[in-house]
């Protein structure tokens, strides 16, 4: 854009007609991420709208026809986890270059979404499956950009697998993870909602730190008197439980504080979605 910002959208894709795709291209949109919840039957059931799957794929193809970079978005939960192999099949058949698999992020005390999340063993199995499917695509000469998002335990887990399968590259992976520093909610990531409210990220909207219609974003973001936001700049000093003693804290960043608050009622408690074992996170003596 003229301001030097990269503009992207996440959408269900159903309203992206050929004309709308041309408009998105004309405004120099960088990327369009289209959400799928599985193959046709499951997707339409999730959305509660007949033919939403077909319309999503039509939107995807319309974007591709205009030369827009596209990708798929898939949020993992108990009801659609079995669809992951089918989604990889779609990735191949539709020649889509990118897919993001999102772990559930629940926020707000008593969140109903907690019961939709996988248990730790299921999550480990899913991450292994995603890595296996990604490797199979690469070996078949169809490399794709495959991301897992919103659970920073994935980084250490991938690294530990790399140690077994490719020790030489494992060191490179570890360095990249250290550089990334894991979760950056309230530090490197922020959210401004449609009405100007400022949040630590797009999930944690039950905490509002100010409004850009009333005060400049920079003043809100760097205000030391906004206690929670100020502490988010240095989470490692405040996290508790397993997070506080974890050897991967520097590359995970303490994961999501919103999940900790939703599950335990304490934003500084350990993230309940961390599936690494006590032995795996134990610091060497």
Locate the predicted segments by residue.
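Short, acidic, Ser/Thr-enriched surface-loop or helix-capping motifs
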Residues: 93, 192-193
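Radical SAM/AdoMet-radical enzyme domain recognition
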Residues: 1-125
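C-terminal accessory region of radical SAM enzymes
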Residues: 121-172, 197-253
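A structural motif corresponding to the C-terminal lobe/cap of the Radical SAM core domain
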Residues: 93, 112-144, 178-182, 266-282
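Short, small/polar residue-rich loop motifs at catalytic or cofactor-binding pockets
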Residues: 183-187
């Amino acid at each position: 854009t003229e301001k030097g910002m990269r503009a992207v959208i996440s959408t269900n894709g159903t309203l992206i007609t050929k004309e709308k795709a041309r408009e998105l291209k004309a405004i120099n949109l960088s990327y369009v991420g289209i959400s799928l919840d599985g193959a046709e039957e499951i997707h339409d059931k999730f959305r509660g709208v007949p033919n939403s799957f077909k319309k999503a794929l039509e939107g995807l193809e319309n974007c591709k026809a205009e030369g827009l970079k596209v990708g798929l978005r898939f949020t993992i939960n108990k009801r659609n986890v079995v669809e992951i192999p089918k989604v990889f099949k779609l990735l191949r058949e539709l020649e889509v270059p990118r897919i993001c698999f999102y772990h559930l992020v629940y926020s707000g005390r008593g969140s109903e979404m907690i019961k939709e999340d996988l248990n730790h063993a299921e999550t480990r199995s899913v991450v292994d499956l995603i890595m296996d499917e990604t490797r199979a695509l690469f070996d078949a000469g169809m490399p794709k950009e495959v991301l897992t998002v919103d659970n920073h335990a994935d980084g250490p887990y991938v690294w530990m697998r790399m140690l077994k399968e490719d020790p030489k590259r494992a060191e490179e992976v570890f360095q990249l993870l250290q550089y990334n520093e894991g979760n950056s909610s309230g530090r490197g990531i922020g959210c401004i909602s449609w009405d100007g409210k400022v949040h630590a990220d797009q999930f944690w909207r039950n905490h509002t730190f100010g409004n850009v219609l009333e005060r400049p974003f920079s003043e809100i973001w760097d205000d030391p008197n906004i206690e929670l936001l100020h502490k988010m700049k240095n989470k490692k000093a405040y996290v508790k439980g397993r997070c506080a003693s974890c050897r991967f804290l520097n590359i995970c960043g303490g994961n999501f504080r919103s999940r900790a608050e939703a599950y335990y009622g304490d934003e500084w408690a350990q993230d309940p979605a961390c599936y690494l074992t006590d032995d795996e996170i134990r610091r060497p003596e």
